[in-house]
């Protein structure tokens, strides 16, 4: 189940927009202060030490996809963890080629998952390289080009949740902890 909500409040005469998303019970909240046009989720400047559980990795990936899909994201201000996740785009190009992101039927989650599984050797035990490529593909597809904003990021989040299993999150957590970034 997905729910989106936006809470607007006025503490100390400064307007803040706090969009939040809940996917299958996992909630993410973001802050964006006006007139500052910057979108910062809580894991944006996280380090590998701030991810301790599978739930932390799920939460981080949810926030990350929302962050890269937001048109006011300042990617140059990303923390080291997000820069690592952004770097996975090259893994996606190596595994899937350069044209898959535009060819996937993002509005049909099941078909997307099946197409991506065709590139994976063992779906129940994906390698770190395959996981990086999947996240990189989602990153490439979620990044807003120009000023166009759409809801494709929700489909990307759903596909990511459907294709990744518990073992994948553990493999990804281990990779993040051992990566040099």
Swiss-Prot record:
Pfam families linked to this entry: Poxv_Bcl-2-like
Name of this chain's protein: Protein OPG005
Lineage, uppermost ranks: Viruses, Varidnaviria, Bamfordvirae, Nucleocytoviricota, Pokkesviricetes
Gene: OPG005
